[in-house]
Structures are given as C-alpha cells and as structure tokens.
UniProtKB/Swiss-Prot annotation:
The modification 3-methylthioaspartic acid is found at D89. Belongs to the universal ribosomal protein uS12 family. It comes from the Bacteria. The gene is rpsL. GO terms for molecular function: rRNA binding; structural constituent of ribosome; tRNA binding. Gene3D superfamilies: Nucleic acid-binding proteins (2.40.50.140). This is Small ribosomal subunit protein uS12. Part of the 30S ribosomal subunit. Contacts proteins S8 and S17. May interact with IF1 in the 30S initiation complex. Keywords: Methylation, Ribonucleoprotein, Ribosomal protein, RNA-binding, rRNA-binding, tRNA-binding. Residues 110-130 are annotated as: Disordered. One of its GO terms (biological process) is translation. It comes from Helicobacter acinonychis (strain Sheeba).
Length: 130
C-alpha cells in the first residue's frame, strides 16, 4: 500500500476499459455495405452452416457480422445496420446484423421474439363468434 507522499509523487493509474466492439467507434450501431455473404461452420462441439456477411462499415472497418434468424435476403452491396454482440461458436464474429432495418428484411412467419428479428405483428383473424 503506497504512502501519501508516494501518491503525491505518482498518482494511481486509471483503468482503461477495452471495448468489445471497436469497429462501432462508441456508437450503438453502424451502417455498412455487404462485401461478401457466405456460410461458415462453428467450433468443435457444434455443427451447422451459420450465415455470415463481411461488411464494410462507415467507420472504414471491415468486419464479419452474423445474420440471425431463418432465411435472409442479403447479397453483395446490400446496405445493412450492424450492432455489437458476438457469436460464441464462430471465432472472429463480434457483430450482428439488425433484421428489419435498411435493406435487411425481417424473418418471415415469426410469432415470438418478433422485435429481435424485425417482424411486424400478424393480422388478427376473426375466429371469435359474436
């Protein structure tokens, strides 16, 4: 433990918090252009074809982003909105594409957790008899 004189001579170092999504540059989301849309396989215990896209952000970073949900309409040159959030079983994927924003369509026939997948509420059919 330092003495008061030691603290006067040299103050304590501030702990700098390292961001987990540096490409967003202090912003909640960033716009970007898809440069490549492809599938990749996850790490060892899991097995699937995960849909990902390489995105060139407005902050000049080129990042790999995960496309959540079943099915998508993205292709090269699509304009997308990217948020932070990693995918645990895909190394190097630290960003998610926001569904239902800009060129990205929402997930079709989604009934639960719709806000996460950009799906509008389905029209209520009149099944009740009056």
């Amino acid at each position: 433990m330092p003495t008061i004189n030691q603290l006067i001579r040299k103050e304590r170092k501030k702990v700098v918090k390292k961001t987990k999504s540096p490409a967003l540059v202090e912003c909640p989301q960033r716009r970007g252009v898809c440069t490549r849309v492809y599938t990749t396989t996850p790490k060892k215990p899991n097995s699937a074809l995960r849909k990902v896209a390489k995105v060139r952000l407005t902050s000049k970073f080129e990042v790999i982003s995960y496309i959540p949900g079943e099915g998508h309409n993205l292709q090269e040159h699509s304009i997308v909105l990217v948020r932070g959030g990693r995918v645990k079983d895909l190394p190097g994927v630290k960003y998610h594409i926001v569904r239902g924003a800009l060129d990205t369509a929402g997930v079709n026939k989604r009934t639960v957790s719709r806000s996460k997948y950009g799906t509008k509420k389905a029209k209520a059919t009149d099944n009740k008899k009056k």
